[in-house]
Amino acid sequence: MELSLSFPVSWLCALFTAIALYCIAVAFYRLFLHPLAKFPGPFLWKISIWPTVWQCAHGKRHLDLLAAHKRHGPVVRIGPNMLSYNTGSAARTIYASRHANVRKSDFHLTVDASVSAPSLFSIVDREKHAFRRRVVSQAFTEKAMMDASEFYLKYMKVFLDVLHDKVGTGWTKVDIQEHATWWTSDTMGDLSLGRSFNCLTEPTFRHAIPMMRNGLRYIYWAGHLPFRDLVDYILAHPILSRYGGQSAVDNRNYFDFCETAIQERIKEEQDALAAGADEESRRKDYIHYLLAAVDPETGEKLTKNELESDASLLLAAGGDAMSNAIAGIMFYLARHDFARDRATAEIRHQFASAEDIRQGPGLAACTYLEACILESMRMAPPVATSPLERVTVGNGIEVDGHWFPAGITLGVCFYALNFNETIHKDPYRFRPERWLSSEEGITAEDVQQSKSNFFPFSAGHRHCPARNLASRNLKVFIANMLWHFDLRPATSLGVNESSGEEGQTGLFCIEDALISIADGPVLEFKARLGYNASSS
């Protein structure tokens, strides 16, 4: 009996000893022999990927990386095989050059693991990405963007009617992020899927918004797990919808919803073509342009699965990213009287009627409003916060004086870059003037330094293809809000008044979940004296 008991015990002891020795050996290698051993960073981050998984799961990775850069400098080792930079030169080297020896990391494969084809965002292969980029960019020509802007304006009018009805003539509390999300969801649903969610006027599909966000949260941390290949397999397996938890279920349901809507829209477009409908009579949405798009180099078109993936991407990125940008801008305008009053005066002086607020010379002349938008997006970036990971390939790459062989993961923490004191003076202070060389004490060189080191939609040939469309309609939205309403902070901004990093107060609180996710702010609005929805 003693022999039979001691036998498994001894084997268990041997097994645990072997595991312990293996872990010690791996830690020793990563600390002292790894190609990144000389770079500073928190101890646990150097030896394990699990701190990254934890940060992603809790939505605070951008704050942890900001603190790490403040402590360790412009380059920080944030994983056993990963570095983060907070310099503009690194961003230009890693992201902007078409010839840089880097590719997207395998994390991106997890983003679309549960669908039939990768989207433009998640394609790792550079040649395949170039093909997709050439095709998808045809949905963002000047003509296509003008057509898309009509969708934004259509739902802008609905939004204003809803807000006027809610606000009336007295000061009324409004969760601006919630209402902006309804606007972007309705707009992007109609534009990307051919189906408006009608969130502004009825609650039926409002559940789809947290469903999409939960899916993003799940992908963000699951894609960084050390057994990512297994995660990708599970994401694509039906068993996930039963045992994967609510976030996993929401991720699957979101893609199923998009797939059904897109298939119906494709059939509608094909039926119109078969019936001989002329070009002018057909809907000019994303599906219309993507179905017609042909790669000028190969003559190929998107497959049905590729079209579904890219339309779903446009819905997610174009909807939540814009609503979070709106939330951040309104937060900072409400908190800073000097900026709000000046931007409001500029808009109301420029436009006698709200009907005139659209893309054109009049809106382009509102330079202070543009500066407020840029400054808000610097302090609360709606898209790029934590590093967009790139893996070195071929003969390696030199970044800020350091040479890296193939197989190293690099990235720029854009949130830390935006608060880099060597680039943006007094970075925790809301200063729209930093973007205007006409302001006293601001030189053209100061403005150029800020603009050349600012990447709200990433950089280079892999930046967001919809960035120009988003920027234009973001400005239209904010201009309409300032024309129609007076605003001020609510008595309490609640969870949206962040303590920031290292005691910095008054920062808008965002969650890092692949893109930024915001909650609120709750602000007080009052209809502009003498104006209402009908008079606009």
Swiss-Prot record:
Membrane-related topology note: Single-pass membrane protein
Gene3D superfamilies assigned to the protein according to its UniProt record, in alphabetical order: Cytochrome P450
Cellular localization per UniProt: Membrane
Positions contributing to heme binding: C464
Its EC number(s): 1.-.-.-
Cofactor entry: heme
Gene Ontology MF terms in the entry: heme binding; iron ion binding; monooxygenase activity; oxidoreductase activity, acting on paired donors, with incorporation or reduction of molecular oxygen
UniProt keyword terms in alphabetical order: Heme, Iron, Membrane, Metal-binding, Monooxygenase, Oxidoreductase, Transmembrane, Transmembrane helix
Pathway participation: Secondary metabolite biosynthesis
Residue intervals passing through the bilayer: 9-29
PROSITE patterns: CYTOCHROME_P450
Enzyme's top EC category: oxidoreductase
A GO cellular-component term linked to this record: membrane
SUPFAM superfamilies assigned: Cytochrome P450
Pfam family, one: p450
Extent of the signal sequence: none
Functional note: Cytochrome P450 monooxygenase; part of the fragmented gene cluster that mediates the biosynthesis of fusarochromene, a tryptophan-derived metabolite closely related to a group of mycotoxins including fusarochromanone. Within the pathway, fscF catalyzes the epoxidation of desacetylfusarochromene which opens the way to the production of fusarochromanones. The first step of the pathway is the epimerization of L-tryptophan to D-tryptophan in the presence of the NRPS-like tryptophan epimerase fscC.
Family per similarity comment: Belongs to the cytochrome P450 family.
Name assigned to this protein: Cytochrome P450 monooxygenase fscF
Organism: Fusarium equiseti
Lineage start: Eukaryota, Fungi, Dikarya, Ascomycota, Pezizomycotina
Record gene name: fscF
